Amino acid sequence: VARLRARNERLVEENDRLHELASAYKAQSGLHSIAGFYRGIEARVIGFPPENESRAVTIDKGSLAGVRADEGVLAVGGVVGRVVAVGPLSSTVVLVTDYTSRIPAVVRRGRWWGIARGNLTSVVVDYIEQDAPLQVGDVVVTGEGRSFHSGLPIGTVIQIERGNATLSQTVVLRPSIDLGALDRVVVVPK
């Protein structure tokens, strides 16, 4: 019985490792697909800011690899942010949750436009027309802009704020990817 129990534990551990490898492979192949489709530059995240600093990361590709300022950055699942500074070997990417981030945004279901801005932990979309019948769960994607192609997932609506005195409404999004767990990204030229 003890040997069977030990063997079972080893098989469970091996199964867990295989699931992790399968997930990593799936993510990597998805990243290759994004890079190929947009002729993007694959990069690794090599630096995160200290707590309570700006919401930016450092990637391991710079001007020598073809990265330029204002290019969009994606990961499997959606928008990461935008390149704001480029060195020869690395670049700084401001995340969509940073206060300085502004992206043209569209609610996919009804094509209602707004501006997505960072709010440190989430993304807020302002200036959506007041009578748009928004719903929690609506997906918001990029509109046509300087840094991004249109139709890329930004996040999902988790809260709707309808202003009485304004002609627009605001929604709060949960970003489409876990920005705290970034590893590999693709810089996408526009």
Predicted region positions:
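A secondary-structure micro-motif
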Residues: A2-A6, R10-K190
